Amino acid sequence: MKLTILSTSDIHGYIYPTDYKKRKQDLPFGLLKISSLINEIKAAETDPVLVIDNGDFLQGSPLTYYTAKQKQQPLIYTSLLNQVGFDAGVIGNHEFNYGKEYLDEAVKALDYPVLCANILNDQGQPAFGKAYELFAFDDLTVALLGLTTQYIPNWEQPASINGLTFQSATACAKEYVPKLRELADVVIVSYHGGFEKDLTTGEPTEALTGENEGYELLNKVSGIDVLLTGHQHREIATVDSSVAITQPGDKGHKLGKVCLTVEKQDGKSVILSKKAELLSVNETKANPTMEEIFNTFQEEIEDWLDQNIGMITGNMLIGDPFQVRLAGHPYIDFIHKVQMEATGTTISGTALFTNDSKGFGPTVTMRDIVTNYIYPNTLAVVRVTGADLRQALEKSASYFSLSPSRQFEVSSDFMYPKAQQYNYDMYAGIDYIIDVSFPVGKRISQFTYSGKPIQENDELEVVINQYRAVGGGNYDMFSADKIIREITVDMTELIADYFKKHDRITPDTFNNFQVIQSKKELHVN
C-alpha cells in the first residue's frame, strides 16, 4: 500500500491567488490553487491520501482581516476552508491574533478536527479538544499528533491566552509518541514550529529560546515516521534520520507531499520507503467550484479595499526598502505620528514589516493601508529606562553588517532561517546614530531626547506595537509588566481614523537617526 500525506502550512488567509495590491490578479499561490492540486492527486490515487493543514490559517491577509473586523465572525472564512477536504488541522500561533473567542468559534465551525496536544486548558486537558487523531485505512492505522510552538505567550496579548498553558513540543511528544506507536502503524507529527538548528550540522541557526523545536523533535523523540513543520515559512522536503520532513513555505506557494510505501510482513505493517517533496502551484489553475461559490464575497472584499480613505500632498511611496531602514522615510514617520497621537506619547518605535511595502501615493485607499501595515497589531505604551531603550536600539542595530567591500547589508541573523525585516525598529522622538563599524552591542551613540543625553536610569514612555511590547522578536528588554497603558483599537483602524481626522496629510521626515560607518578597520561580529 502507498500512503500519501499532503500538507499545507502558514496559508495566512491567502485563499485567492492575489496579494490584494490590485484587483484581478492571478499569482502563483493561494488555497484555491492548492485545492486544485489536492483534487488532482486524489483523483490519480487509488491508495489512501491524508490532507493536513499545519496551522496559521486564521490571520494574515486582507480577507481574514475583513472577516474578523468587518464581519466580526469567521463563518464565511471557515466555510471556505471546509471546501478543501482537509482531514485534520493544527493550531498555529497566529490563530490567537483575533482573540480566543474568535478562534474557538472558528474551530467549532470547521468540519475536520483541529489538533493540539501541548496547549492545555485550566483542567490540564488539550484546550481544543483533541491531541491526536487515528485514521484507519483497511488494516493500516495512522496516528496524527498535533503540536504548536510553545512560544505564543511571548507574543500574544494575555487576554487572548487566558487560562491556557503552553508546554514544550518535545516534552509533549515524548509523552504521546510511545503511546501512539502502540496504537498505530504509522506516526505523523504535525508541528506548527520550525527548526532551531541546521539539519546537517546541528549548529544553532537562531537563539535557542524554545520557539522552534523541530531539530529536537527529530533527534530526541524516537518513533516518528513523518514530521510536518511550518511557522518559519521555509521550503524543506527531505528524509532525515529515517523521518520524512516537509515545510511548504507560506501562502500556498507549495504543497507538501510525503509518500510512504507500506507492506505487511508477518502480520505487521512495515514502511519500506519514504519520499518527501514540495509541489508548486505555478502551473495550477484555481479551483473553479470554490471560486464560483465565494466570488461574491471576494468582490465584496475588493470593493471594501478600494474605498478612498485619505489624501496626501505629494506621496509617501517607497522605492528602496533598505534605504528606508538606513535613513528613515515619510511613511515610517507617518506611522510614528499615528502612534504618538493615539497614545499621547512623544517617543515611538515601529518597523517596515516587509520589503513588499510600497508606501502611500497621493490618494490612499483601504487597500493601501492593509497591504502596508500587514499585521493586526494594537499599541502599547511601555515605561522603560534609558538603559532598556538603548538595549532595544542595539538589538535593532544588529540588523546591519558590512560586506567585504564595506557596503551596508542585512545581517544573516535577520535573513536565515527566516527573513525578519519586521524585527528592525526605527524610532522617533529621540535622536541616535548607529555606527556599523563597531561590534554588535556597541553601535549606538549620540543617544538624546529633547537635545539632552539619555541616561541609563532615565524613565521614558515609549509607544510600540503589542507584539514588541511583550518581548516579541527576542526584544527581552520589553515585557508585559512594563506596559502602562494599551490602545485596543487595531492599528489599521487607527491609520484610517488619522486620515479621516486630517483632511490632507503633508509628508514629513524627522531625520532623527543615521546609520554610518566611522572606522576604517572592519570589525568581524
Task: Go through each PLM region and give its residues.
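Alpha-helix initiation and N-capping motif
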Residues: L31, P74, K100, N287-F294, ...
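Feature captures C-terminal
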Residues: K2, Y14, F29, L110-A117, ...
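Short, compositionally biased low-complexity segments
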Residues: I5-H12, T149-Q150, E300-G314, M366-D368, ...
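Acidic, metal/ion-coordinating pockets
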Residues: M1-T284, L326-I332, K337-V338, S348, ...
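A short C-terminal boundary segment appended to hydrolase-like catalytic domains
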Residues: V262-V364, V470, F499-N525
